[in-house]
Amino acid sequence: MSAVLDLTCELIARPSVTPDDAGCQTLLAARLKQAGFQCDHLRLGEVDNLWATHGQGAPVLVLLGHTDVVPPGPREAWASDPFTPQIREGVLYGRGTADMKGSVAAFVVAAEQFVAAHPDHTGTLAVLLTSDEEGDAIDGVRHVARLFAERGQRIDWCITGEPSSTATLGDLLRVGRRGSLSAKLRVQGVQGHVAYPEKARNPIHQAAPALAELSARRWDDGYESFPPTSLQISNIHAGTGANNVIPGELEVDFNIRYNPHWDAPKLEAEITALLDQHGLQYTLKWHRSGEPFYTPEGTLRATARAVLAEHIGRAPEESTGGGTSDARFIAPLGAQCIEVGPVNASIHQVDENVRVDELEALPGLYQRLVERLLV
């Protein structure tokens, strides 16, 4: 097997369901130390974080990834054990193949090959890994970024290995991500018998106009390559289960994916004002997952576009779509951030997989990116 295929299989065999690293970072740190990297383990609580650097000074280029995976679900639903890597007809199957142990293995192999070829390269090449990307994302890169801010650690460029490609490796370059803000709304009413509505206060009826206004509102018309901001109601719960009882409380969960027109405080204030206009008796609990980030035209974006175009024979699509990634914690440090990784068609699914030929091409892709930036 190739170096990247062998290492990917070793990582898949470690059942690192978030936030358990299951020894992945110990394995990777040993490889990086042997290649001449200085490795710092930044564990917090149950979360493992690894910061490995080679070289010194600016510019600082970070390869950002995660060693944790989502739970596999019922084992019997898989064609083969999710933590026993298996190749069938040129495709590697296993939990984490695409998201994102394949990219992590490719990072390490590319880093090894790069420093062997360019031991006295310009600036600093760093690898940052966490076991808390798929979970709460509190003690992982968010924590490390806070440490970096306190230390004054500079980061110029960040390449995240999230599975960004859609049909073939390199066909999409992620140049930003929307912010994510979640809320739990509780509307208080007065429980009562449905035959005596005058003695009760129905929170569903009271909240319905406000929810209709929230869901129908057009927040903006988009920003650069970002789509318009979107609010989606994800859960609604009220009632006792009986059809003759007016509920005493309504609970609503919603999420907003927003572009750089907004930040979390502005959205929170806007939504609170809207709810107040409807005279509701309510509480609102917010959870800020991360602000949006966007990498405008510059050295990193232009370099990545050129490298991907050489690989696929045409210019890649440049997008800000998808969910959130840990790059949202690195961007506020002043870094230009992009995401380049394998095809995302099977991520978080049963029988997650990656094509072997595309996995084996990934280290070369990353190495060319690093060489264009640090040589």
From Swiss-Prot:
<keyword id="KW-0028">Amino-acid biosynthesis</keyword>
<dbReference type="InterPro" id="IPR011650">
    <property type="entry name" value="Peptidase_M20_dimer"/>
</dbReference>
<dbReference type="Pfam" id="PF01546">
    <property type="entry name" value="Peptidase_M20"/>
</dbReference>
<dbReference type="InterPro" id="IPR001261">
    <property type="entry name" value="ArgE/DapE_CS"/>
</dbReference>
<dbReference type="InterPro" id="IPR036264">
    <property type="entry name" value="Bact_exopeptidase_dim_dom"/>
</dbReference>
<keyword id="KW-0479">Metal-binding</keyword>
<keyword id="KW-0378">Hydrolase</keyword>
<dbReference type="InterPro" id="IPR005941">
    <property type="entry name" value="DapE_proteobac"/>
</dbReference>
<keyword id="KW-0170">Cobalt</keyword>
<feature type="binding site">
    <location>
        <position position="134"/>
    </location>
    <ligand>
        <name>Zn(2+) 2</name>
    </ligand>
</feature>
<feature type="active site">
    <location>
        <position position="68"/>
    </location>
</feature>
<dbReference type="GO" id="GO:0009014">
    <property type="term" value="F:succinyl-diaminopimelate desuccinylase activity"/>
</dbReference>
<protein>
    <recommendedName>
        <fullName>Succinyl-diaminopimelate desuccinylase</fullName>
        <ecNumber>3.5.1.18</ecNumber>
    </recommendedName>
</protein>
<dbReference type="InterPro" id="IPR002933">
    <property type="entry name" value="Peptidase_M20"/>
</dbReference>
<comment type="function">
    <text>Catalyzes the hydrolysis of N-succinyl-L,L-diaminopimelic acid (SDAP), forming succinate and LL-2,6-diaminopimelate (DAP), an intermediate involved in the bacterial biosynthesis of lysine and meso-diaminopimelic acid, an essential component of bacterial cell walls.</text>
</comment>
<keyword id="KW-0220">Diaminopimelate biosynthesis</keyword>
<feature type="binding site">
    <location>
        <position position="348"/>
    </location>
    <ligand>
        <name>Zn(2+) 2</name>
    </ligand>
</feature>
<feature type="binding site">
    <location>
        <position position="99"/>
    </location>
    <ligand>
        <name>Zn(2+) 1</name>
    </ligand>
</feature>
<dbReference type="GO" id="GO:0006526">
    <property type="term" value="P:L-arginine biosynthetic process"/>
</dbReference>
<feature type="active site" description="Proton acceptor">
    <location>
        <position position="133"/>
    </location>
</feature>
<feature type="binding site">
    <location>
        <position position="66"/>
    </location>
    <ligand>
        <name>Zn(2+) 1</name>
    </ligand>
</feature>
<dbReference type="InterPro" id="IPR050072">
    <property type="entry name" value="Peptidase_M20A"/>
</dbReference>
<comment type="pathway">
    <text>Amino-acid biosynthesis; L-lysine biosynthesis via DAP pathway; LL-2,6-diaminopimelate from (S)-tetrahydrodipicolinate (succinylase route): step 3/3.</text>
</comment>
<comment type="similarity">
    <text>Belongs to the peptidase M20A family. DapE subfamily.</text>
</comment>
<dbReference type="Pfam" id="PF07687">
    <property type="entry name" value="M20_dimer"/>
</dbReference>
<keyword id="KW-0862">Zinc</keyword>
<dbReference type="GO" id="GO:0008270">
    <property type="term" value="F:zinc ion binding"/>
</dbReference>
<feature type="binding site">
    <location>
        <position position="99"/>
    </location>
    <ligand>
        <name>Zn(2+) 2</name>
    </ligand>
</feature>
<comment type="subunit">
    <text>Homodimer.</text>
</comment>
<dbReference type="GO" id="GO:0008777">
    <property type="term" value="F:acetylornithine deacetylase activity"/>
</dbReference>
<dbReference type="GO" id="GO:0050897">
    <property type="term" value="F:cobalt ion binding"/>
</dbReference>
<dbReference type="GO" id="GO:0009089">
    <property type="term" value="P:lysine biosynthetic process via diaminopimelate"/>
</dbReference>
<feature type="binding site">
    <location>
        <position position="162"/>
    </location>
    <ligand>
        <name>Zn(2+) 1</name>
    </ligand>
</feature>
<dbReference type="GO" id="GO:0019877">
    <property type="term" value="P:diaminopimelate biosynthetic process"/>
</dbReference>
<keyword id="KW-0457">Lysine biosynthesis</keyword>
